[in-house]
Structure formats: C-alpha cells, structure tokens
Amino acid sequence: ADLIQRRQRSEFQSDIKGILYTVIKKNPDL
C-alpha cells in the first residue's frame, strides 16, 4: 500500500508540473 501511495504522489507532482508548465507558456508575463 505504501508503494502505491508513493507512486500516486509522484504522478500527482508530475501532473502539477505539467499544469504549471502550460500555464507559464500561456502567460509568459508570469
């Protein structure tokens, strides 16, 4: 169970990085 939680957390972090990346690309002023 611990391994699954760790994997979900890493996937969640990568999703956030992807979202932030697209947001920054759409708003270069930031």
From Swiss-Prot:
Keyword Oxidoreductase: yes
Record keyword RNA-binding present: no
Signal peptide: none
GO molecular function (one): oxidoreductase activity
Main enzyme class: oxidoreductase
Domain of life: Eukaryota
One cellular-component annotation, GO: chloroplast thylakoid lumen
Subcellular localization(s) per the UniProt record: Plastid, Chloroplast thylakoid lumen
UniProt KW keywords: Chloroplast, Oxidoreductase, Plastid, Thylakoid
EC number: 1.-.-.-
Sequence intervals crossing the membrane: none
Family to which this protein belongs: Belongs to the peroxidase family.
Listed name of the protein: Thylakoid lumenal 29 kDa protein, chloroplastic
